[in-house]
Amino acid sequence: MNPWQALTSAGDSAVLLPLIVWITLWLIVPHESRRDGWRWVVAVGVCGGGVALSKLLFMAWDIGLPGLDYTGFSGHSAMSMLVWPTTAALLTRRANVSWRSVAIGLGILLALSIAISRIWLKAHSVSEVILGSAFGLLICGWFQKGKPVAQQVSVRAVTLLAGMSLLLVLACYGRVFPSQHILKQVALAISGHDMVFSRQMPLP
């Protein structure tokens, strides 16, 4: 596996979806963080739903952004920009502001690397990656703004989050979730067309 493929695998739904579910449970089960859990559900729903909608509009009805090489937001870019910085922030809730900022910065750097890998592997155009990354970062910022103070989280809870997250990533890394195939089937069903719309020119 080349480095770009290794990076892009870290942004696949096969890795991110189990991590999202685990973070949801980690936040919702304890009463004191339940509000945050529901905010997280909203953030994931808006991000994932926005990506899916942007792709379905293009695949089903050829609705895109005029003047851009665009077929919908890059899902890897958007979801990575939401999940990885958020994971870093949750893991460092007990740390001081400086360490939390460094951790979130590293999460954003990983998400940016995943986004760049999508361009390098010719999976998305530059516009799709930029728009997807900006969309995910915007939603991540909204979620982080409502995050409770660090002192409310126990060492045991953070250790549980870190350990299970690591196990999930190790178990799911390298797998590919058929999200694009699912969206194509949905686009065909809702449009009534025999084929979905696709990019006319190959990526440079």
Model-assigned labels for residue ranges:
Residues 55-68:
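Helix-loop junctions on the outward
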Residues 1-57, 93-103, 109, 113, ...:
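Terminal transmembrane helix and immediately flanking juxtamembrane interfaces
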Residues 83-97:
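Internal transmembrane alpha-helix with an interfacial aromatic "cap," most often the third helix
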Residues 68-82, 121-132:
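Histidine-centered catalytic micro-motifs
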